[in-house]
């Protein structure tokens, strides 16, 4: 967590006093995720909007598909978000009004970090060039139907 939050710029030292029996396991507390609901290539414009809602796992120009996890939400619920929408340019003078600050670099996870991150309703895809997280049920309607079928806890 420290390495992720500091974006790789932290030094950490520790000393051990000994070993003790492990107590009760802590419950997992993770915020929700940002889920792409349209397939295509991500755009800087839409990622700027998504960045306001949480931490991104993808950068601009990345191919995404429906149900792919593109970031972590700042709140506890999952949000379906459009990360492929482009900015409509109607007038050249107006296009310079909407210049936003640059994107923060996306968080790149190792296999171990991704395995620790995913929940029961999520999967991890491992390919030679990429590591992708996705929902088990890709479409939003399928996930809503599944939630209705499950008894509330």
Feature roles, as predicted:
Residues 1-153:
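Accessory interaction regions appended to the cores of large information-processing enzymes
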């Amino acid at each position: 967590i420290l390495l992720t939050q500091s974006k790789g710029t932290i030094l950490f030292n520790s000393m051990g006093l000994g070993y003790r029996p492990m107590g009760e396991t802590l419950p997992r507390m993770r915020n929700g995720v940002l889920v792409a609901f349209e397939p295509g290539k991500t755009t800087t414009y839409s990622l700027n909007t998504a960045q306001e809602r949480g931490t991104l796992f993808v950068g601009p120009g990345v191919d995404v598909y429906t149900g792919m996890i593109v970031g972590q939400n700042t709140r506890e619920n999952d949000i379906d978000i459009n990360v492929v929408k482009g900015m409509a340019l109607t007038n050249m003078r107006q296009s310079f009004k909407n210049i936003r600050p640059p994107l923060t670099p996306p968080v790149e996870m190792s296999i171990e970090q991704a395995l620790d991150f995913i929940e029961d309703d999520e999967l991890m895809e491992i390919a030679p060039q990429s590591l992708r997280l996705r929902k088990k049920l890709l479409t939003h309607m399928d996930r809503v139907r599944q939630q209705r079928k499950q008894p509330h806890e």
